């Protein structure tokens, strides 16, 4: 049996690890260190570590794959193949050169589009009709290696990062299992990427989380769902940041950012060509709530108030 190292960290990667281990056996899992989570800063293991331990696989959590210790750990195992999926660290060339069959990555986009760390977010924000998963060889440049295979996944109008993430994780799992026999036998396809068609999906910045309403309703809706359920979009309301968790396209007109309707269905906010309805939100210092609860508890008239008012 081939020796396989799996590298991954978040929820996206855990089912991929499980399926890979059950089909081919994984000798070692490498994942990010445990991190403090929440207000109480509780040290929490990444989902891939939890999955690996439930499967009885040895886990290694280096601070950096660039360290001599990490190199030696991988080198000592003499793996035939490294499989990565949303690992969160760039592998140095000397690690990429270790496995006899190379290193392959399960990437959540249709490469060469959306290379980088936030392909799911950026595909939704940009209003793409399709996303997908590509399995490719890893090279020194980020997400630029030869492609083995890909699968297309439709993006529905109300998909969020969360729902699309789950669809792509399933698609990535299925595609990996499909290509593994040919990868292990060295008979798989290798298609070079066209660098002239490459686009990049860098991690979402704080500035990109800020929603403006002087755009089309569809652009605003895409922005909100493209950041939900993490890191969550926000806009300024009554002098404070309000997180906007969920939205839908609505009818109506008014000045961009103006609340034109507030009832049990939510807050309807005007855009430059129509409106969006906010159905779930989080006022500053409070927990997430449905917009109907916010409307019911409002101490002042909401209709006519504006988001992002200077």
From Swiss-Prot:
The GO cellular component terms are: cytosol
Q: Does the keyword Transport apply?
A: no
Which InterPro entries did the record assign? Fmt, Formyl_trans_C, Formyl_trans_C_sf, Formyl_transf_N, Formyl_transf_N_sf, Formyl_transferase-like_C_sf, GART_AS, Met-tRNA-FMT_C
What would be the name of the gene that encodes this protein? fmt
What terms describe the molecular function in GO for this protein?
methionyl-tRNA formyltransferase activity
Q: Where are the transmembrane segments?
A: none
Class of this enzyme: transferase
Q: Which residues bind (6S)-5,6,7,8-tetrahydrofolate?
A: 109-112
Please state which protein family the record places this protein in.
Belongs to the Fmt family.
Cross-referenced PROSITE patterns, in alphabetical order? GART (PS00373)
User: HAMAP family annotated for this entry?
Assistant: Formyl_trans
> Can you name this protein?
Methionyl-tRNA formyltransferase
Q: Which reaction does it catalyse?
A: L-methionyl-tRNA(fMet) + (6R)-10-formyltetrahydrofolate = N-formyl-L-methionyl-tRNA(fMet) + (6S)-5,6,7,8-tetrahydrofolate + H(+)
* Record's function text: Attaches a formyl group to the free amino group of methionyl-tRNA(fMet). The formyl group appears to play a dual role in the initiator identity of N-formylmethionyl-tRNA by promoting its recognition by IF2 and preventing the misappropriation of this tRNA by the elongation apparatus.
Question: Which UniProt keywords are given for this protein, alphabetically ordered?
Answer: Protein biosynthesis, Transferase
The protein's Enzyme Commission number: 2.1.2.9
